[in-house]
Amino acid sequence: MAATPAAIEVSLTIVFVLFFSADVSLTRNSEMKAHTSKMDSYSSSIYMNVLPTSLAQTSYHLAPISHLKCLSVQFSSHIHYSYYYGASVLERCVFHRSRIRGARFIVPIPFIAFPRHKNVFSQCTYFRRIPLGCLQRCSCSFWPRKSQNQICFEPSLRGHLIFVL
């Protein structure tokens, strides 16, 4: 029995949809593997957040950390934070490297520079990568202290961190 044109069209549509879905899945898997390999190379390089237009369209480039300044804070024996920042336009980011119970991840946080004589408050939102591979949305606040040359960083889930720059 010969197939009708309508049945052939439906079959071709199903095949196309299945192929397209498989192609999208493979593309996402390859992107995740590439991103994971970049994340694994954090010991010799650091991510520079070039243009964070959106979560899906965030471009990175690798840069050596030798010329970047580092600020470290030890919360406890198993929680450690390191913040990196540079002087150029592409390096005006603070990079948050955390080790929580052996899990390692790097998150770019926009670095906000303040004039020393102004008491400006600013709120920014960043995405933290948790050990399970998901992205957790967090918010933090930057503001300069009136006394001395200090900038306070207050994450939403932690206490106050005061760094003397």
UniProtKB/Swiss-Prot annotation:
Transmembrane segments: 10-27
Membrane topology reported for the UniProt record: Single-pass membrane protein
Compartment(s) where it occurs, according to its Swiss-Prot or TrEMBL record: Membrane
Superkingdom per UniProt: Eukaryota
GO CC term, one of those recorded: membrane
Keyword set, alphabetical order: Membrane, Transmembrane, Transmembrane helix
Other observations noted: Partially overlaps DAN3.
Descriptive protein name: Putative uncharacterized protein YBR300C
Organism, scientific name: Saccharomyces cerevisiae (strain ATCC 204508 / S288c)
